[in-house]
Structure formats: structure tokens, C-alpha cells
Design a protein with these regions (language model features):
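Gly/Ser/Thr-rich loops at beta-strand to alpha-helix junctions
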Residues: 130-141
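Long amphipathic alpha-helical segments
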Residues: 1-95
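Short helix-loop-beta connector
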Residues: 125-129, 151
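Short internal beta-strands
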Residues: 154-160
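A non-catalytic, amphipathic alpha-helix used as a structural packing/dimerization or gating element
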Residues: 52-56, 101, 116
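Short glycine/proline- and acidic residue-enriched helix-loop micro-motifs
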Residues: 99-107
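Distinct, well-ordered alpha-helical segments
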Residues: 141-149
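A short, well-structured juxtamembrane/interface segment
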Residues: 109-126
Length: 160
């Protein structure tokens, strides 16, 4: 088992990585490291063996904590790209292409989506509004930071 997957599983179990976006982002980062560090065993085909390694890793993570919907979509994407990887490419080229695809997926589906939500939600906060939240959400935090950036007069009160 790759060390990044083990660390992520422990973080899921103890709750130190929580929230849908944070968990999906951490999953993609761990899968990226797994792919980047992967070495094809002698006599194996990258797409088949890496697919099995990803399956085993996901099984471990599900045992630590069930996947959210966005995480399930990310796993489907990564597995489909691994299965499609060309046997004609050298292993280093195939790994590089897979890492680039994971990075692009992460940018589009996690980072861009979070920025779009923050942009839209920040528009609902106006001068003089009081916003009280309970708990922590990356999307809510990003929205409030964007609203704070837009407003001229600001007052903040944070409670731990």
C-alpha cells in the first residue's frame, strides 16, 4: 500500500480531513502520488496492474470512511483513465500522462467548482449583513473570504 494512501486513510478515520471538497481534493492528491510513484512489476502491463493497485487502495480508503459522491466520481475518472492508458507508451510517459489528467480533473472539478461556488455565494452577502456559521466548510469559508474581499466596510467576529 502506498504511504500517501495509508496517511489519507488514517486522516479520514480520525476526521482530520473532513468535508466533501477537502476529502475529494485529498483523494486526488493521494492518487496522483500513487500514480507518479508507481513502478510496473516485471512482466506486467501498466494499465492492468495499476488498475488493480488503485482498486486495492480505494477499497482500503472505503474501509476507513465511505466515499462521498464527488469522491466516487473522481475514482471513476481515475480508473477509466488508467484502463485507457496506452500499452504503446513507456511507463514513465504513461505515468506522466495520467498525472497530468489527474491534475486537470482536480483543477476543473475541485478548484474551479469551489471558486465558482464562492463567487456566486459571495454575491448574497451585502454591506451590514451578519453571517453566523456553525462548523467548518471549505466552500463556506471561500464564499465568506470572497465576500470580505468585495465589501468596503468590514466587521468580523470569529468564534472557535
Amino acid at each position: 500500500m502506498h504511504p500517501a494512501i495509508l496517511r489519507l486513510g488514517l486522516a479520514y478515520s480520525d476526521g482530520s480531513v473532513a468535508g466533501g471538497s477537502a476529502r475529494a481534493d485529498a483523494l486526488l492528491a493521494a492518487l496522483r502520488r500513487l500514480v507518479a510513484d508507481y513502478a510496473v512489476p516485471e512482466g506486467k502491463v501498466l494499465s492492468r496492474d495499476l488498475y488493480a493497485v488503485v482498486n486495492t487502495s480505494i477499497g482500503f480508503l472505503v474501509e476507513c470512511r465511505p466515499l462521498s459522491a464527488s469522491m466516487g466520481s473522481a475514482v471513476k475518472f481515475v480508473k477509466s483513465q488508467v484502463a485507457r492508458s496506452s500499452a504503446d507508451l513507456r511507463p514513465a510517459e504513461a505515468r506522466g500522462a495520467l498525472v497530468a489528467l489527474v491534475d486537470a480533473y482536480r483543477a476543473e472539478k475541485v478548484e474551479f467548482a469551489l471558486a465558482a461556488v464562492a463567487e456566486r455565494a459571495a454575491g448574497y452577502v451585502e454591506e451590514g449583513d451578519v453571517v453566523l456559521t456553525y462548523g467548518h466548510s471549505g466552500a463556506v469559508l471561500a464564499s465568506l473570504l470572497e465576500a470580505d474581499r468585495r465589501l468596503r466596510r468590514r466587521r468580523r467576529a470569529l468564534f472557535g
